[in-house]
Amino acid sequence: MSKRESSKYKIDRRMGENIWGRPKSPVNRREYGPGQHGQRRKSKLSDFGVQLRAKQKLKGYYGDIREKQFRAIFAEASRRKGDTPENLVGLLESRLDAIVYRAKFVPTVFAARQFVNHGHVKVNGVRVNIGSYRCKPGDVIEVKEKSKQLVTVLEAVQLAERDVPDYIEADHNKMVATFVRVPALSDVPYPVVMEPHLVVEFYSR
């Protein structure tokens, strides 16, 4: 198992949920946590614990974003007009690594970040190697010509178990995607329930 896969499944085990809907997730095989004490009855979480868990799950889903960076994203969501939970999700889904993942150019969000960081992606014809780069509606994201034959890309396109959401248009023959619009929370195909309103409560304590 690769280090990237190990990190991904570690998050699943920590959350006790298959947060990416992956068939190989260890939580599909058991309903309790890892380790010798995993089968003990879970204690009821406090309000703080529920809020913390919601934050960890949302952070984890997008590749275990570092706390400092995630807090900065939340701060921007709070400053923007409109509903803060909706703004938060919109900002997360506007990340370049998230769009590369949603477009099914790679199998996981972890792979998407690495793929971008290694310089395999262009935005509007310009190479961008920052996973957190924020895309705007109308931006065209494409896999570099020399990168289209990478095994990771080919397997993702051929074996993907996810549908491309309607706020992204993807051409898998050309490996080009367009970020059509910033989605609402209800548009995002999370395999599990995400509760960004609890993230707002956590940071508003």
From Swiss-Prot:
BP term (GO), one: translation
Top-rank lineage group of the source organism: Bacteria
ATP-binding recorded as keyword: no
Biased composition (Basic and acidic residues): 1-16
Residue numbers spanned by region Disordered: 1-46
Gene Ontology molecular function: any one: rRNA binding
Keywords associated with the record: Ribonucleoprotein, Ribosomal protein, RNA-binding, rRNA-binding
UniProt domain S4 RNA-binding: residue ranges: 94-157
InterPro entries the record matches: Ribosomal_uS4, Ribosomal_uS4_bac-type, Ribosomal_uS4_CS, Ribosomal_uS4_N, S4_RNA-bd, S4_RNA-bd_sf
Disulfide-bonded cysteines: none
Signal peptide positions (record): none
A cellular component term, taken from the record's GO annotations: small ribosomal subunit
Family: Belongs to the universal ribosomal protein uS4 family.
Oligomeric and partner information: Part of the 30S ribosomal subunit. Contacts protein S5. The interaction surface between S4 and S5 is involved in control of translational fidelity.
Function, in words: One of the primary rRNA binding proteins, it binds directly to 16S rRNA where it nucleates assembly of the body of the 30S subunit.
Protein's recorded name: Small ribosomal subunit protein uS4
Source species of the chain: Rhizobium meliloti (strain 1021) (Ensifer meliloti)
Underlying gene: rpsD
